[in-house]
C-alpha cells in the first residue's frame, strides 16, 4: 500500500534543501497521513488518510 491518502490523493513531495550559501540537496516532505479504518465499498478497511481529510469530516472512522 503506497503512502498516499485515498481520499485527497496527498502524498510525499520532493524539493530542495537550501543552505545560506544557496547550495541545494534533495529532500522530501511527507504528508501527515494516518492509518485508519474506514468503510470502503461497504466493508471496513485499514487505509492511509490525511489529517486534513479527517479534520474536515470528508471521511468517517469505523
Curated annotation (Swiss-Prot):
SUPFAM superfamilies found in the cross-reference section: L28p-like
GO CC annotation terms, alphabetical: ribonucleoprotein complex; ribosome
Disulfide bonds: none
One Pfam family matching this protein: Ribosomal_L28
UniProt keywords, alphabetically: Ribonucleoprotein, Ribosomal protein
GO molecular function, one term: structural constituent of ribosome
Stored InterPro entries: Bacterial_rp_bL28 (IPR050096), Ribosomal_bL28 (IPR026569), Ribosomal_bL28/bL31-like_sf (IPR034704), Ribosomal_bL28_bact-type (IPR001383), Ribosomal_bL28_sf (IPR037147)
Chain spans, region Disordered: 1-24
Biased composition (Polar residues): 14-24
HAMAP family: Ribosomal_bL28 (MF_00373)
Family: Belongs to the bacterial ribosomal protein bL28 family.
Protein name per the record: Large ribosomal subunit protein bL28
Species, as recorded: Bacillus pumilus (strain SAFR-032)
GN (gene name): rpmB
Amino acid at each position: 500500500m503506497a503512502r498516499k491518502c485515498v481520499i485527497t490523493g496527498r502524498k510525499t513531495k520532493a524539493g530542495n534543501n537550501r543552505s545560506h550559501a544557496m547550495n541545494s540537496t534533495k529532500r522530501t516532505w511527507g504528508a501527515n497521513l494516518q492509518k485508519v479504518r474506514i468503510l470502503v465499498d461497504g466493508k471496513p478497511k485499514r487505509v492511509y488518510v490525511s489529517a486534513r481529510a479527517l479534520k474536515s469530516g470528508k471521511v468517517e472512522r469505523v
